[in-house]
Each structure stands twice: as structure tokens, then as C-alpha cells.
Amino acid sequence: VLQDTVLFKDTIENNLKYGNETATFEEVKKAGIMSNSNYFIKNLPDRYNTVLSEGGSNLSQGQRQLLSIGRAILADPKILILDEATSSVDTRTEKNIQDAMRNLMANRTNLIIAHRLSTIQDSDVIVVIDKGEIVEQGNHKQLLEKQGKYYNLYMTQFSGKEI
């Protein structure tokens, strides 16, 4: 799941099935529900048969990200790479995307590249890279206790809110 979602001029159903072309409509709809994209799809005039503009330009960035997550749910990879999946969306949309990502990340190996620490704080292992070098690693709690680079980033992003 990339920061810039690739969608093509076709139906939402077919854009989702790009991750698994043999998926049934029921599987597509389940992926829509699990990815939280069903909440906006059900309000579209043709729902899953709605034709997207090239690149999905008739959807918001957050909606495109949710479809990308739905596509990944249908693909069901053993290893999942999330590259800045929430970087260009507002805070409310980020919450929807993070909820969808929890569904997607369950029971698989995940590699998450993120600047927003809210995206990674539930990870088993967090590797902090600064200027191309690994400077810290551990889980969220361990890294906060070290009060190093991760701690400073966390405090900057969350303005000292309770940890």
C-alpha cells in the first residue's frame, strides 16, 4: 500500500479486484467493509459499479487509500509493505485508514514506512532511521523510555499529550 494510490478508469469493483482478479463480488464487498471503504461506496449512485476517473481523481485521497487497502485485503499477501499510507490525509481520515490497516495487518508480516508515529506505535519492533543510519530499535514503550530520537519525534508530534 503506497502513499500514492494507483487506480484506473474502471469500476470500483474492478479496481479492488486488481489485487485478486478471481475474487467474487461477496469477497470484494467484504474487503470494502474491512477496509472501511464501504462507508463511502454505499453512498455512490452505482456503489461498486461506479466508474472511477483515471487515477481515481473523482475520489478524495483518503478514499483512494481505503480502496488501496481493500485491494491489499483481497490480495492477501504473506508480507505487506505500507509506505507512508497515511501521510497525505487529514487526522479524521487517518483514523479510518488506521482502523482498516489493523484489519489488513493481522496475522502477517508487515513492513511499515512512516513519519506519523501513530501509524507504527503498535508495532512489535520499531526501527528508527536517521540520515540513513539505524539509531534506535525496540517497541513503542521501550523507545519512549530511552528518551532518544523516537521520544523526541513522539513528543513533537503529540505535543506532550499523555503517553
Name each model feature, range by range.
Residues 145-163:
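C-terminal boundary and immediately downstream tail of ABC-type ATPase nucleotide-binding domains
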Residues 10, 42, 121, 151-152, ...:
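Alpha-helical elements of the RecA-like P-loop NTPase motor core of helicases
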